Amino acid sequence: MKALEEELFSKFQLSAQQYNALRLLRSVYPASMQTLALGKLLISRSPDTTRMLDRLEQRQLIMRERRSENRRVVEIAVTTSGLDLLDEMASDVQAMHRRQLGHLNRTELRDLTALLKRIREPHEDASCVWLDE
């Protein structure tokens, strides 16, 4: 499964972590999200979140802004270029998911999702919106 992800994301010069960050930022668009909040939501919590965001910013897929009242707080927002890239990737991402999980029926997929949520729930901040889906 990981090989399929790497194959897809490398086609767009992204890592799975970068894709996930863009996807999470799109979920709050047009608003922004603080770096710390994004870090808590990422599936794989990497210590080099700043470098990952640097790479996305260099490609103009995100923009960062420091709050004037507290310069330590950095707000991140996806740009229109980032949104365009996610749109461009959408059909390929769906095809990848079909290759990864297409052998499961609807009930099995629902059960898998429920189990994954249950596994992750004790480790999540109560504010995680995906737990309520």
Feature roles, as predicted:
Residues 1-4, 89, 119, 123:
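Hydrophobic recognition helices of helix-based DNA-binding modules
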Residues 30-32, 94, 120-123:
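A short hydrophobic/aromatic micro-motif that marks alpha-helical segments and, especially, helix-coil
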Residues 4-45, 128-131:
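N-terminal helix-turn-helix DNA-binding core of bacterial DNA-binding proteins
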Residues 1, 42, 46, 90-93, ...:
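Flexible interhelical turns and helix-capping residues at alpha-helix boundaries
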Residues 54-117:
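Charged, amphipathic alpha-helical coiled-coil/dimerization segments
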Residues 107-133:
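C-terminal regulatory/oligomerization modules of transcriptional regulators
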